[in-house]
């Protein structure tokens, strides 16, 4: 990546469009999105949140939403995409995953301008419609001055009668959910609003449909990006078995110039809190915290 970034930093790279392709355990994570640099950041525009020509939820399709969040936490300003990387034909219609670019100028340059502005969202449903603004600014925007409040407005619609919206969330640093709309009557209006305090560096929208399809938007960034968070969560058992111990290990990173104190860390299964600790240590500046481990006695998915 250093060699590519060195090439990208040259004047000839100023008008280029670059994307982080299929991040994950199989293909790599670009050194966990290391070597952030403001010039390179301004020339990287996208990261795949999904990839593959297989049917959504089946083999050959590789969702990577957690790596979208990781890249944002590392300070990158990126829009999500959901592409096919198709080696088998049926280019563009092998599955229902789509990249949506918001523009009223469908010329080549108009589309490129929208890509550079990151007015995009990634969806597993081919015709899901999402609109998203914060204080009137479109997705992909940056509010350099931190306002007193954030007025978040979301519109969402699927024209297919057989599809429904089950949940819409505001996602912030480290993948935390800052707000959720899940009342069917409210969701049925397709017009959602909430006012939040500006406590985080970025805010994006995640939509969950009744059939499980997901969509995520580009964020709106607020103030200077805080570059710290979770870099890895691993299970010490390759094949967990119910009733046997399972150790979950969390590694935290801090790319800021000052130390960061961990106020609390919580492990949960859904809404059930398994364990929580306060004053869990300090992540040194430009460093990582020795992994924090939790041993679970049953095989379940665990969230940190």
Give residue spans per PLM region.
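Extended, charged catalytic domains and RNA/DNA-binding interfaces, predominantly
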Residues: 1-224
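Proline-enriched interdomain boundary motifs that mark the N-terminal boundary
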Residues: 130, 227-233
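Short acidic/proline- and small/hydrophobic-mixed sequence motifs that coincide with surface turns
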Residues: 163-166, 241, 257-262
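Short, solvent-exposed loop/turn segments enriched in Ser/Thr/Gly
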Residues: 243-249
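Asparagine-centered strand-capping/turn motif at beta-strand->loop junctions
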Residues: 252-256
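Short acidic, flexible loop segments centered on an aromatic residue
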Residues: 260-272
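Intrinsically disordered, low-complexity Pro/Gly/Ser/Thr-rich segments with frequent PxxP/GP/PP motifs
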Residues: 274-294
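Conserved small/polar residues in nucleotide/adenosyl-binding loops
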Residues: 295-302
């Amino acid at each position: 990546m250093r060699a590519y970034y060195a090439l990208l930093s040259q004047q000839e790279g100023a008008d280029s469009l670059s994307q982080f392709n299929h991040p994950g355990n199989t293909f790599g994570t670009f050194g966990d999105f290391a070597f952030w640099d403001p010039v390179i950041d301004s020339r990287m525009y996208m990261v795949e949140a999904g990839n593959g020509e297989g049917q959504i939820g089946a083999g050959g399709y590789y969702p990577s939403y957690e790596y979208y969040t990781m890249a944002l936490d590392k300070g990158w300003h990126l829009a999500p995409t959901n592409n096919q990387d198709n080696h088998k034909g049926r280019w563009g219609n092998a599955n229902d995953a789509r990249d949506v670019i918001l523009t009223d100028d469908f010329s080549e340059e108009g589309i490129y301008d929208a890509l550079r502005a990151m007015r995009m969202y990634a969806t597993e449903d081919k015709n899901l419609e999402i609109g998203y603004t914060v204080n009137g600014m479109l997705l992909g925007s940056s509010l350099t001055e931190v306002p007193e409040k954030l007025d978040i407005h979301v519109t969402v619609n699927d024209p297919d009668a057989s599809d429904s919206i089950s949940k819409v969330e505001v996602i912030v640093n480290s993948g935390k959910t800052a707000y959720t709309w899940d009342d069917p009557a409210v969701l049925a209006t397709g017009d959602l609003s909430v006012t939040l305090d500006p406590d985080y560096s970025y805010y994006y929208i995640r939509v969950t449909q009744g059939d499980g399809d997901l969509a995520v938007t580009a964020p709106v960034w607020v103030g200077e990006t805080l570059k710290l968070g979770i870099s890895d969560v691993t299970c010490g058992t390759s094949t967990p078995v119910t009733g046997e111990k399972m150790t979950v290990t969390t590694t935290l990173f801090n790319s800021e110039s000052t130390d960061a104190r961990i106020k609390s860390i919580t492990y949960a299964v859904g809404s059930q809190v398994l364990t929580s600790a306060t004053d869990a240590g300090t992540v040194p500046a430009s460093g990582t915290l020795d992994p924090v481990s939790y041993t679970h006695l049953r095989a379940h998915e665990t969230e940190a």
